[in-house]
């Protein structure tokens, strides 16, 4: 008889995993396999069950039924500590760091002494191309850098299974490239990677195998090369929505309330005029935004975009310069007064500064209106508002009083957008609006943002997704090391040019529009 070589068992095999919450089935007999040295991408709409499945594998949640095996050995009663010992590490979509501890302390937290090797940590950081200051507090980092710290925690634990939940959501293309390079090094060492993402080009670039989840089950699974982009999108789309056109824009235009569209329609004055503004992380910033205009703000992480946005909203003090909103100087105003004047900010970190996680959905969606109008409890009105946004953005939830923290990350982001829109913005500053949002929902959000602009609301659009910036913005300001490196519009506004300018190159390629600064030579002039 010919000698038969036994096939080694998969690194990870999940069979028949099911899970319910309060009688609602969220996972339906899931089978999932990960081989050594493989990237297995996991796709699915918000609420499809991806995060729940990964939390079960990582020992955070127990399954109701099913078996988890590593290298052919069953794993019973998994806890996060046991999962770490087995080499399973989940890098969450929302960084979960100790804000008051240093970066180094966060990376080494609870590591056994034999693994807490500072030389190894330095080498891993070098391999990733990271230039993090290990002595600063983790809470002072941008979200993208916090994400890299989370990944470092997994790498320091010699993880054999690395679960990455939307790891590139807040990373620039250069940072994404470095991360992928490090992942490929890990693959050569036999590490298996579960890669959760909504970015189909990244999945094609990195993943060997792809599984698509829909409504708690596996709708499609196989080699990535065997499926077209359309195959994946169709597999993600619920049957009830196939062939249906989004009505987000129509619903938004039907929303009641004074959107100030009439008062701005005939005005030629900018909604906001920022002159020579300086503050923590940026200097000598000047620009204006007209009613109905979407102004993109691009740059690499650390360029000062979020610091600028927070200063405009009054969360940080300005050291010099002026901010004029509808001909009123608001530079010294408190945040509450800026909100009352119509300046609304959708923050980058929804869990830390955007939503009240333990409060009901219906209360959250009207929270800024509460702050502005003192309407602390109008249940019927709140329910009606939430229902409109549920239909417009396809927000998935069970009941009105459900706490926000029970929603998936993408649905939390949609709720935050709804909350900001309901505050009746005159100027809306949007920081990473599609972070953690699936492919099918992005188009809804884009249409919604455009429909707001059509109602003469001025929009400052901040995103690390440069293709998204080009798609959405009428003009783009590119920041580099806290200053405006140039302004782009028209045909000059493309990903390649923005990328070069974001890394400090000076390109005079803007098409002037109504006094807009046209080159890097005009730093400090009105853009």
Swiss-Prot record:
Skewed-composition ranges (Polar residues): 510-521
EC number of this enzyme: 7.6.2.13
Membrane topology qualifier: Peripheral membrane protein
Domain (ABC transporter) ranges: 12-240, 266-506
Subcellular location(s) of the protein: Cell inner membrane
Gene Ontology CC entries for this record: plasma membrane
Molecular function terms, GO-annotated: ATP binding; ATP hydrolysis activity
Major site of localization recorded for this protein: membrane
Region (Disordered), start-end ranges: 508-527
Listed InterPro entries: AAA+_ATPase, ABC_carbohydrate_import_ATPase, ABC_transporter-like_ATP-bd, ABC_transporter-like_CS, P-loop_NTPase
Keywords: ATP-binding, Cell inner membrane, Cell membrane, Membrane, Nucleotide-binding, Repeat, Translocase, Transport
Top-level EC class: translocase
UniProt binding sites for ATP: 44-51
Reported function: Part of the ABC transporter complex LsrABCD involved in autoinducer 2 (AI-2) import. Responsible for energy coupling to the transport system.
Subunit structure: The complex is composed of two ATP-binding proteins (LsrA), two transmembrane proteins (LsrC and LsrD) and a solute-binding protein (LsrB).
Family in the record: Belongs to the ABC transporter superfamily. AI-2 autoinducer porter (TC 3.A.1.2.8) family.
Protein's UniProt name: Autoinducer 2 import ATP-binding protein LsrA
Organism for this UniProt entry: Yersinia pseudotuberculosis serotype O:1b (strain IP 31758)
């Amino acid at each position: 008889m010919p000698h038969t070589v036994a096939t080694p068992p998969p690194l990870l095999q999940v069979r028949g995993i099911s899970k319910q919450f309060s009688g609602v089935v969220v996972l339906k007999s899931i089978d999932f396999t990960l081989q050594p040295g493989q990237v297995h991408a996991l796709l699915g709409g918000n609420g499809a069950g991806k995060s729940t499945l990964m939390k079960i594998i990582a020992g955070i949640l127990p399954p109701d039924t099913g078996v988890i095996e590593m290298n052919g050995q069953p794993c019973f009663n998994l806890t996060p500590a046991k999962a770490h010992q087995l080499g399973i590490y989940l890098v969450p979509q929302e960084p979960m760091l100790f804000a008051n501890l240093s970066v180094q302390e966060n990376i080494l937290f609870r590591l056994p002494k034999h693994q807490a090797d500072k030389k190894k940590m330095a080498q891993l950081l070098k391999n990733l191309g990271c230039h993090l200051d290990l002595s600063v507090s983790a809470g002072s980092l941008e979200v993208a850098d916090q994400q890299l710290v989370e990944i470092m925690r997994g790498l320091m634990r010699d993880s054999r299974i690395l679960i990455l939940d939307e790891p590139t959501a807040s990373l620039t293309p250069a940072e994404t490239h470095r991360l992928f390079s490090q992942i490929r090094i890990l693959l050569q060492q036999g590490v298996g990677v579960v890669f959760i993402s909504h970015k189909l080009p990244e999945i094609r670039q990195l993943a060997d195998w792809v599984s698509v989840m829909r409504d708690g089950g596996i709708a499609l699974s196989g080699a990535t090369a065997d499926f077209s982009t359309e195959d994946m999108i169709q597999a993600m789309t619920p049957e009830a929505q196939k062939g249906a056109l989004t009505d987000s824009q129509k619903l938004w235009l039907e929303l009641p309330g004074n959107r100030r569209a009439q008062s701005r329609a005939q005005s030629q004055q900018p909604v906001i005029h920022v002159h020579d503004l300086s503050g923590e992380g940026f200097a000598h910033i000047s620009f204006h935004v007209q009613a109905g205009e979407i102004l993109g703000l691009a740059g690499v992480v650390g360029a000062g975009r979020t610091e600028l946005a927070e200063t405009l909203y009054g969360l940080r003090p300005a050291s010099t310069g002026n901010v004029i909103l509808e001909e009123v100087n608001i530079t010294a105003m408190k945040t509450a007064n800026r909100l009352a004047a119509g300046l609304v900010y959708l923050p980058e970190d929804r869990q830390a500064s955007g939503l009240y996680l333990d409060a009901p959905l219906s209360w959250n969606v009207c929270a800024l209106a509460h702050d502005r109008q003192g309407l602390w409890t109008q249940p019927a009105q709140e329910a009606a508002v939430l229902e409109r946004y549920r239909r417009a953005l396809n927000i998935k939830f069970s009941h009105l009083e459900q706490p926000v923290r029970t929603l998936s990350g993408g649905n939390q982001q949609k709720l935050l957008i709804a909350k900001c829109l309901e505050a009746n913005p005159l100027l809306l500053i949007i920081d990473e609006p599609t972070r953690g949002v699936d492919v099918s929902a992005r188009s809804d959000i884009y249409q919604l943002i455009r429909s707001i602009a059509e109602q003469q609301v001025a929009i400052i659009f901040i995103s690390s997704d440069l293709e998204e910036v080009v798609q959405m913005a009428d003009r783009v300001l590119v920041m580099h090391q806290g200053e405006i490196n140039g302004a782009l519009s028209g045909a000059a506004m493309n990903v390649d040019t923005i990328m070069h300018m974001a890394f400090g190159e000076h390109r005079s390629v803007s098409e002037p529009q109504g006094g807009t600064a046209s080159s890097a030579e005009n730093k400090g002039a009105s853009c």
